[in-house]
């Protein structure tokens, strides 16, 4: 029996199939779990309004296949950020968060990975950061009351580009229900000291994403998607050695 649970992101599986089939494929491929996506598309946002019957159907598929959905990648806040200048957009951000937590409760999802963006399609300023903080404080309080963990992804933008940067938010929010969900690709693209970053956050890492990236330099903006494993900047062997030395026992 391996020490770590190994999961697959929903978007790595066929799109237009049932959840029963999706979980069955993951099982046949040797994965332990699937991470569900609630992104900024209307199609996946609609999952937040699934009926009781639809939720029960997925719960039954989880039980019948033995493949769990312990985590949700909630990237919808890229479209509806807490830090937005637009009040309607901010209201939608709160609504999305509330519905996502309820969906997590219903499906047994323990960790919601949230995007570390104060804003994405707007310019950042002190106001966007302040509103993001208000949103995070509210969201973590709601998640905590439902025993759901909110884990911030290390992102493809500088605002949340390292565990060091996330740590400043951890010191502000100060909750066991507010953790970090590093992506080794994003972390490596922005930072030369990946081992030190992992050491800094080891006590609050909920899970880890694995992908390769091209590094951000003075002459290159980096590439955060669609980089074949082994062709990018991530030193996977060294990352795994560091995590083993830190006694990391979470999922990948």
Give names to the regions the model predicted.
Residues 20-21, 27, 61-65, 80-180:
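Active-site acidic/histidine proton-transfer and metal-coordination neighborhood
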Residues 5, 127, 134-233, 240:
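Acidic/histidine-rich catalytic cores of soluble enzymes
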Residues 8, 26, 34, 62, ...:
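Conserved, mostly hydrophobic/aromatic
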Residues 9-13, 37-41, 74-77, 117-119, ...:
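Active-site beta-loop-alpha junctions enriched in small/polar residues
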Residues 41-46, 78-84, 118-125, 189-191, ...:
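A short acidic, helix-capping loop that chelates divalent metal ions and anchors anionic groups
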Residues 31, 67, 104, 109, ...:
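A structural motif
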Residues 35-63, 116-123:
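Glycine-rich, proline-tolerant flexible connector loops at the mouths of alpha/beta enzymes
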Residues 4-10, 34-36, 69-74, 112-114, ...:
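Hydrophobic faces of well-ordered beta-strands that scaffold small-molecule active sites
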């Amino acid at each position: 029996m391996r020490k770590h649970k190994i999961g697959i992101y929903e978007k790595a599986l066929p799109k237009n199939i049932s959840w029963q089939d999706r979980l069955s494929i993951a099982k046949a491929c040797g994965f332990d779990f699937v991470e569900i996506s609630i992104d900024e598309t209307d199609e996946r946002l609609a999952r937040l309004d699934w009926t009781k019957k639809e939720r029960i159907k997925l719960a039954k598929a989880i039980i019948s296949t033995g493949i769990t959905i312990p985590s949700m990648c909630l990237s919808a806040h890229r479209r509806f950020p807490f830090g937005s200048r637009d009040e309607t957009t901010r209201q939608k951000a709160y609504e999305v968060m509330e519905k996502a937590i309820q969906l997590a409760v219903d499906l047994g999802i323990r960790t919601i990975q949230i995007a570390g963006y104060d804003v994405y399609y707007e310019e950042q300023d002190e106001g966007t950061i302040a509103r993001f903080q208000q949103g995070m404080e509210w969201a973590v309080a709601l998640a905590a009351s439902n025993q759901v963990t909110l884990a911030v992804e290390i992102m493809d933008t500088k605002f949340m580009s390292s565990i060091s940067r996330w740590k400043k938010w951890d010191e502000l929010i100060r909750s066991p229900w507010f953790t970090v969900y590093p992506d080794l690709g994003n972390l490596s693209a922005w930072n030369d000291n990946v081992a030190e970053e992992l050491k800094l956050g080891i006590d609050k890492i909920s899970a880890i994403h694995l992908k390769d990236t091209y590094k951000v330099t003075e002459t290159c903006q980096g590439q955060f998607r669609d980089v074949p494993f082994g062709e990018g900047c991530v030193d996977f062997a060294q990352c795994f050695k560091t995590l083993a030395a830190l006694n990391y026992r979470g999922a990948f």
